[in-house]
A protein has these predicted regions:
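Divalent metal-dependent phosphate-bond-processing catalytic cores, especially two-metal-ion Mg2+/Mn2+ enzymes
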Residues: 4, 8, 12-21, 33, ...
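His-Asp-centered metal-binding catalytic motifs of divalent-metal-dependent phosphohydrolases/nucleases
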Residues: 24-51, 59, 80-92
Length: 220
């Protein structure tokens, strides 16, 4: 399950960073709670698509306005850190955080979320993620607007994705938004970049060439 995968990724990242035990435990708690708004999104809309609702904001509402956070931690000492990290974990860009510890935990959960998403994208059926077979995905092209964002080493804006390959490239573009060397170490050790790129059998010649460009740009 993704939630527990994020908890484990948070543990690994904070351990490699050499953080104090309190911050390690706090990062794992944030990992456990970061997608709590997803359950309501699924209940209401039967979808995880970002245009149905802001699951991060709803998670904050459930935890702090409705008081569910006290079921997980009695002390309110860390409420501001937890609230900020969860509220910001799915933002396109991480902005507007002035407190250094809040910023650190917001960066950790974003890294851990993306790191476990690598596992998810390798293990889940392509049909489940994209609605068609891997072979069908590999027949499609990458839109110029999406490639321009890759060239700029930016995450892909959801509204610019038009083809199935656009969606697949958007998963790879997560790597442009990694914050910590500890996370990069795990990505390299697991060979996630090549494994994800190689999962799709590309048959469109233009796509084959573009994906080699993507590979060379992302590799670090």
């Amino acid at each position: 399950m993704h939630t527990y995968g994020v908890v484990e990724c948070s543990r690994q990242i904070t351990q490699r960073m050499g953080l104090p035990e309190e911050d390690r435990q706090l990062a794992q708690l944030i990992g456990l709670l970061h997608d709590i708004g997803r359950f309501e999104q699924l209940k209401r809309y039967n979808s995880f698509e970002p245009n149905t609702m802001d699951h991060a904001s709803f998670g904050v509402q459930i935890l702090f306005e409705e008081g569910m956070i006290r079921q997980f931690v009695q002390d309110n000492t860390w409420d501001s850190i937890i609230r900020t990290a969860i509220a910001k974990h799915s933002d396109y860009k991480l902005e507007g955080i002035e407190d250094s510890r809040e910023l650190m935990h917001a960066r950790i959960i974003r890294d851990a979320d993306k790191l476990d998403n690598c596992r998810v994208k390798l293990e889940d059926p392509i049909e489940t993620m994209l609605g068609v077979s891997a072979e069908e995905v590999g027949k499609t092209k990458i839109s110029p607007e999406v490639m321009e964002q890759v060239y700029r080493k930016e995450s892909i804006l959801s509204q610019t994705r038009k083809t199935k390959m656009d969606y697949w490239v958007s998963y790879l573009a997560y790597f442009f938004d990694i914050n910590y060397e500890a996370t990069f170490q795990i990505i390299r050790e697991q060979n996630y970049v090549d494994r994800l790129i190689n999962r799709i059998p590309y048959s469109n010649p233009e796509t084959v060439a573009k994906m080699e460009e993507v590979r060379s740009i992302i590799h670090f």
